[in-house]
Every structure is written in C-alpha cells, then in structure tokens.
Amino acid sequence: MGLMHKDFHSGNIINQNFALSYITDFGLCKPVTENEPENVYGVIPYMAPETLSRGEYTKASDIYSFGMVMLEVLTSYPPYYNIPHNENLAMGICEGLKPEIKCEIPQFLKEIMEKCWNFEPLNRPTAEELGSQLGKYDYRCNNEIRKQVNNQINVANKSNKNFIQYDPNVKHSEAIYTSRHLPFVKSKKFETHDTKQCNFVIPDDINDIIEENEIQEN
C-alpha cells in the first residue's frame, strides 16, 4: 500500500483474542513519499534513530517500532520503562542505545526482534520478510522446526521460572507512553557554501619573472 503508520506502539494495538490483534490510530499515517520532519510526534522508546535524529520516517521506521512491541509482548516490560523519556533518551537511541531484555526469550524470536532494532534502516527486515520469518514457526511448521521451537520455549520457561512480571508502579515518573509532539527533533540541514573555481596557469616566461623579482629584491 506504500503507507507508514508513523506512530506504532503497544498503545495502538487492540486484541480481539489470543490469536487476533488490530493496529489502530492511523491519524499520522502517510504515504511513504510524504514526510514532515519539522512536525514529529511519537513515543520516544518506539521511535527509530533516523526519526529521532532528523525527523525521517520510512517503512523501516515502523519495523523498528514493531521490534519494540515484540520486546514488550515477550517480556511484559515496555522499553526504557525506568528512565525519563526526554531528549537524553532520544540522543542515546541515536547513538545506538538498545533496551534491556529482562528475561530469557526463545532464540528464534530474539533474533527476529533484534533484526528489527538494527540501527541501519536498510538492514531491518521488511514487513514481507517478517511475515515469512514468523510464518516458518507457526503451528503448521514441519516436525524438525517444531521440535527446535519447543526446545527453545522450554529453555526460556525454565530460565524464567522466578521471573517477576512488569509492575506499572515501578515505571519512572517521566516515562511517557502516549504520543506527543517532540519539538527537539529537527530535520537535518546541510550547510551549503558558494564555491568558485579558479584556474591557475603557469606562464611560459616563469623563469624570467623569477629572475626579475630576485634582482629587485637585491
């Protein structure tokens, strides 16, 4: 469809049942050809580095957000729940900061999640690739893959036996999980300078000129 959601986070997802969820709040949804880098809205922990650094939205930015939603679904902890959601966090994300993974996650899901977090947009999977990768592990997968998946899930469950689920009461008072305008995000501006090309030509009588200057100096 060539659209970007531009505000994808767990607060914009509703569940009908265990197997069916819907993405909501398409108020900021735009075609991929439309960007408003001077008017950036979002929830900082779910926003991609390129969006926070220069107000740039792409389909890959939504994939980054999907990776953060995966973290919350798999661990119960929203990203960066224990620190202020301010310009310092935005700067950290732009410098490569990643959220803490609070518990053991089945390896096949962890690998997909961390690919979505890749700092470089072009290195993140597309939505089509995500569908294909996740589809390999559904209930219709072959016996060998199902065995690997079950083993990874069992290992994670065993490791998480005493895991403490997320308690909203431990959330930092300045951790904000609602979409808001972020005035500190500005489009990247490149300074340009007028340049002039100068042509330098060595005259044929350069030796005579040098000798004449030497005589005058003496």
Give a label for each model feature.
Residues G2-N15:
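Catalytic-loop of the protein kinase fold
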Residues P37-T51:
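Conserved activation segment of eukaryotic-like protein kinases, specifically the C-terminal portion
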Residues R54-K59:
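Activation segment
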Residues D62:
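Conserved catalytic-loop aspartate of Hanks-type protein kinases
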Residues E104-W117:
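Conserved C-terminal C-lobe helix
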Residues W117-E129:
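A conserved short helix/loop substructure at the end of the activation segment
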